[in-house]
Amino acid sequence: MIAVRVDHSQDADSRWYTGSGIYRDVYLVYANPVHINLWGVSYETKVKRNSAVLTVKTEIDNNADKNLDVEVFNRVFDREGKIVNQGKQTFRVMADKVSGCEMQLDIQSPKLWSIDNPYLYTIVTEVKRNGKIVDKSETRAGIRKLTFDADKGFALNDQPMKIKGVCIHHDAGCLGAAVPKEVWQRRLKSLKGIGCNAIRMSHNPQAT
């Protein structure tokens, strides 16, 4: 048994309501000595006229005492679960270090993420060693084009857009810091209804 305890008695006051205690999920992660680093899959997008390039970056943590060769597989699924592209790369991860690789995948006729249609793809990353999967990760990905111009301002997917935002602390008032998802659903619906399209999350991490 593993017990996690939080003691906030030494610093129980603040300029804002902290919520104290554990208000986010707690996970115990058991991983293979060769595994995807925590938050180790990221991506960048480059939108063209009728296509987009999705650059997937993967960090592999090798806790073994020797260099090892691994295979990294990336598959991109659309919202309906159809594979739109995939790729494989073999590289060597150094002993007791984090090594990274990049893979570029072309997406034809991509559905772009926008405020009114937040379309998301899913990147499934698998790491194999000697033909066996040693780790797997799923990452939601939105393909969009962001541009900033000193004269024209901000544009999303080449469409001018005014950023109309609010600042929200991590708590939900009398409901505490462990905010139920239903509260966020109501908040976001209300904010969008008054024209809000951006949120600054402060100051602490939000509850999951």
Can you annotate each of these PLM segments?
Residues 1-208:
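Secreted/periplasmic carbohydrate-active enzymes, especially glycoside hydrolases
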